[in-house]
Amino acid sequence: NLKKEDVIILPIINFIAASNLASMLQAKIYYADVCPNTGQMTPETLKACVKKNKLKNIKAVVVMYLGGNPDNIKNFYYLKKKYKFYLLEDACHALGSKYIYNGKIYNVGCCIHSDICVFSLHPLKTITSGEGGIVATNNLDIFNRLIKLKNSGIDKKDYKKKTNFPHWLYDIKYPGLNYRLSDINCSLGYSQLKKINKFISKRKKIA
């Protein structure tokens, strides 16, 4: 629900997609520096960005797992609670990755320590559907909004409670677009899930 003049912080090394979207929504975009060893934003560079620009009301922070390495998520989680921002994981490189928090292993995408996690299904990523992506969240409000936005804002929920309602009957409660993958794309992506462990092992060897 990013609005005009809302503050969003991104790592300076990232794909242009997140910046494009924030710019289209007329948000205020700030870029945090990255660690020279990992290429990733760190809690320290995030705090430095906040201090340098005297930011107070931060709406969202995007962390990007360059090379599939979910670095520092637990420390970003502490900052999320402190500054009350939405934490988004750009896990386009990290499908199948895991991280350790308080001695427990978590899958990237579980969204226990973030609000939203996104994966890419581009041909260069871990698995592909030709194009497209995946959004994960544990936030029910965000989930319901995503469901409405993905299909041109169409909402059939109220009518599904009734019996024998016409299939063409629906409401438009939000402006939305068509974010649905075709059946062919979905079939390709689903078939690649069977190979994901093999793909990850090969990438580890190369790394």
Segments (PLM) and residue ranges:
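Conserved donor-binding loops in enzymes that form glycosidic bonds
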Residues: 12, 66, 193
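Active-site region of PLP-dependent enzymes
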Residues: 93-106, 113-207
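Active-site phosphate-binding strand-loop segment of PLP-dependent enzymes
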Residues: 37-129, 134-142
